[in-house]
């Protein structure tokens, strides 16, 4: 506890201004007692004090009781004192918020009320800024409290008597307890500026806060997803068979000597972690080792289990994963990010005893089953997402979670320090274990949802392009082609002409078309890959920016583009935010060209609805019919039923229509037939 010197009373120092030490934390607090007026105090926040301490002159005598166990406290001069009086369950009101303190001890320290470290821990995360501090109520509600630059002590002889209701006793003069004196008030600003060394102080406090963040992170990180010192084992799951009488068996696989050696190592590790155990289950699924590019990055093979048969036989979990576009809208406009990855997330979810036999697998070492949710079960992502949503839903204004990925986003560093602290505190509270090596703190650029998010732009991570370029020009079968087209679809927002680009390849996947890969197909693959040498960073539209969609249609395809108008120093700049394209269905190919243009608008709005609801936007098209179509009054002619439905659907949106000349519709260039034929 700090040792404070009392200064002269205010009446004796009329020409002296007193300022608190810049490293001291004084805040306003208020106490209420029956029969007394409100008692306003300048409280000292002392993280070095283990207890909350108050003067006997600020809490009425009838509220003090003898402590069950008197405590001995060592003070600054090295001597010890015994504290025997305590006040229990006191309410301290700070900026209108009630903070309940279980115990306050009585001791004369020269300060009315000392808020000790037990209070800071009870309402953590506690964060200090240059001009304020933050306590957190109920683990989720941050309370911002301004620091005092001048502090006084009111608790002297006669103070409580003067605070009784209807008392006519004059209140004693407050005693100034500020520790820095300024003899000339005119010099206050200059001396404060010099004394605080604001830039250095800010750096020092930032370092302190970063250190606190690192300490919080360390508390919740481990290489063991079931670390007994950190897990609370609160995540539980149950899996059930559709037909409980049926045993699900898949015959074992054959293994090479090298695979057997690798299994020896991995099974031992899993047993040591206590995530698996020997099994007598009637069910059986084969385990095998994967050695693809993603696993090479880990430096070794990884054991996986083929649960295809079990997944067909068990009841699914319909809990939805978050929509990725919705998550991206949450973080738009934010300036600073931190991201965290749950350590082997699914393994932090314990299976009940009845479910464990369903996870049984075979390998060279024998028959085992999981104590936790294993990777490969169809229910695993939904089970984990439900638990994570339950834990972090209260923080949705600055945190989003996609399965085992957690992202924290803020407008500035000060807010971010608080936000990160609250998330880490919640992880600590629930025993959610994070990976230290995958944590990214206080970044302007992060990877999330397979995207690089940087300064208001986004694009696919580099490995997406690497996968595309590493695909062979000659494909072996339909499965390999499906994987290639799947990667293209993943990056569809960044490829303006994807529908027509993939159509010749998509046609080879039809059920009635036998597999055949020709020289022309190889040339076409080379052409596709050549045209995908990089993805442009696209703009992430801010809520206040006006949005535009531009559309166009050809005989077989439609395309759309989302743009935003960014105003910078009075200049309007149109920035591309997303691309989408598609092919018309067989029946739609017979529509009139005007209807195809209308359908292109509708399809584009559907794709970008997350951004276009509920805002007023602009539709830009080179089709002269669409503007009049919106205003036409159809009277129920059955031949025009499609148009009536389209009008009704469009009426749910607020937009203007701008017609542009075909020569000015640069987006139409993206719908060229360049990819329809190899030799075009």
Swiss-Prot record:
Segments forming domain Reverse transcriptase: 273-453
A Gene Ontology BP annotation from the UniProt entry: proteolysis
Molecular-function annotations in GO: aspartic-type endopeptidase activity; endonuclease activity; RNA-directed DNA polymerase activity
UniProt KW Transferase keyword: yes
Reactions catalysed: DNA(n) + a 2'-deoxyribonucleoside 5'-triphosphate = DNA(n+1) + diphosphate
Enzyme Commission numbers on file: 3.4.23.-, 2.7.7.49
Catalytic residues (UniProt): 46
SUPFAM superfamilies linked: DNA/RNA polymerases
Keywords: Aspartyl protease, Endonuclease, Hydrolase, Nuclease, Nucleotidyltransferase, Protease, RNA-directed DNA polymerase, Transferase
Coiled-coil ranges (or none): none
Primary role: Encodes for at least two polypeptides: protease (PR) and reverse transcriptase (RT). The protease processes the polyprotein in cis. Reverse transcriptase is multifunctional enzyme that converts the viral RNA genome into dsDNA in viral cytoplasmic capsids. This enzyme displays a DNA polymerase activity that can copy either DNA or RNA templates, and a ribonuclease H (RNase H) activity that cleaves the RNA strand of RNA-DNA heteroduplexes in a partially processive 3'- to 5'-endonucleasic mode.
Protein family: Belongs to the caulimoviridae enzymatic polyprotein family.
The record's note on its domains: The polymerase/reverse transcriptase (RT) and ribonuclease H (RH) domains are structured in five subdomains: finger, palm, thumb, connection and RNase H. Within the palm subdomain, the 'primer grip' region is thought to be involved in the positioning of the primer terminus for accommodating the incoming nucleotide. The RH domain stabilizes the association of RT with primer-template.
Protein name (database record): Enzymatic polyprotein
């Amino acid at each position: 506890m700090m040792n404070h010197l009392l200064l002269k009373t205010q009446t004796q120092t009329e020409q002296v201004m007193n300022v608190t030490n810049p490293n001291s934390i004084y805040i306003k607090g208020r106490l209420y007692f029956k029969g007394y007026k409100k008692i306003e105090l300048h409280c000292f926040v002392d993280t070095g004090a283990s207890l909350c301490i108050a003067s006997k002159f600020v809490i009425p005598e009838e509220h003090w009781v003898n402590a069950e166990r008197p405590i001995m406290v060592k003070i600054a001069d090295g001597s010890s004192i015994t504290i025997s009086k305590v006040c229990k369950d006191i309410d301290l009101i700070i900026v209108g918020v009630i903070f309940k303190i279980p115990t306050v001890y009585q001791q004369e320290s020269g300060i009315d009320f000392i808020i000790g470290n037990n209070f800071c821990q009870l309402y953590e995360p506690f964060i200090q800024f240059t001009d304020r501090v933050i306590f957190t109520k109920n683990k989720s509600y941050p309370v911002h409290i301004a620091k005092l630059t001048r502090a006084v002590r009111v608790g002297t002889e006669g103070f409580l008597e003067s605070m009784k209701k209807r008392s006519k006793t004059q209140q004693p003069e407050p005693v100034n307890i500020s520790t820095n004196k300024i003899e000339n008030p005119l010099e206050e600003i200059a001396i404060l500026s010099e004394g605080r060394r604001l830039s250095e102080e800010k750096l020092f406090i930032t370092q302190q806060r970063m250190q606190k963040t690192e300490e919080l992170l360390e508390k919740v990180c481990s290489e063991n997803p079931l670390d007994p010192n950190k897990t609370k084992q609160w995540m539980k799951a149950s899996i059930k068979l559709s037909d409980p009488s049926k045993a699900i068996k898949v015959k074992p696989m054959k293994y090479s000597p090298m695979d057997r050696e690798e299994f020896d190592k991995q099974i031992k590790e899993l047993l040591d972690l206590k995530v698996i155990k020997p099994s007598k289950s009637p069910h059986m699924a084969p385990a095998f080792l994967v050695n693809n590019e993603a696993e090479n990055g880990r430096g070794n093979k990884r054991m996986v289990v083929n649960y295809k048969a079990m997944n067909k036989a068990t009841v699914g979990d319909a809990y939805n994963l978050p929509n990725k576009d919705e998550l991206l809208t949450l973080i738009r406009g934010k300036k600073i990010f931190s991201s965290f990855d749950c350590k082997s997330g699914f393994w932090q979810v314990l299976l009940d005893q009845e479910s464990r036999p369903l996870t049984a697998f075979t390998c060279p070492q024998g028959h085992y089953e999981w104590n936790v949710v294993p990777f490969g079960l169809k229910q695993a992502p939904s089970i984990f997402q439900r638990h994570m949503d339950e834990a972090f839903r209260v923080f949705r204004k600055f945190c989003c979670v996609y399965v085992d990925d957690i992202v924290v986003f803020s407008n500035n560093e000060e807010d971010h320090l608080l936000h990160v602290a609250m998330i880490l505190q919640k992880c600590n509270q629930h025993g959610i274990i994070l990976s230290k090596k995958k944590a990214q703190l206080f970044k302007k650029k992060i990877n999330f949802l397979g995207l690089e998010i940087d300064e208001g732009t986004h694009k696919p991570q580099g490995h997406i392009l690497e996968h595309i370029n590493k695909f062979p020009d000659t494909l072996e079968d339909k499965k390999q082609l499906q994987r290639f087209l799947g990667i293209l679809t993943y990056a569809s927002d960044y490829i303006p002409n994807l529908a027509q680009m993939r159509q010749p390849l998509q046609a080879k996947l039809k059920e009635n078309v036998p597999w055949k890969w020709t020289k022309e197909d190889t040339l076409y693959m080379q052409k596709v890959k050549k045209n995908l040498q990089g993805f442009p960073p696209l703009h992430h539209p801010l809520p206040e920016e006006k949005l535009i969609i531009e559309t166009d249609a050809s005989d077989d395809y439609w395309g759309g583009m989302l743009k935003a108008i960014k105003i910078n120093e009075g200049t309007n700049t149109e920035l591309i935010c997303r691309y989408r394209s598609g092919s018309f269905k067989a029946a739609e190919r017979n529509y009139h060209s005007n209807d195809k243009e209308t359908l292109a608008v509708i399809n584009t709005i559907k794709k970008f609805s997350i951004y276009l609801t509920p805002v007023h936007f602009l539709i830009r098209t080179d089709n002269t019919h669409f503007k009049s179509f919106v205003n036409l009054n159809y009277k129920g002619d059955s031949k025009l039923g499609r148009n009536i439905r389209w009008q009704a659907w469009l009426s749910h949106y607020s937009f203007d229509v701008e017609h542009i000349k075909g020569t000015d519709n640069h987006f139409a260039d993206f719908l060229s037939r360049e990819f329809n034929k190899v030799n075009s």
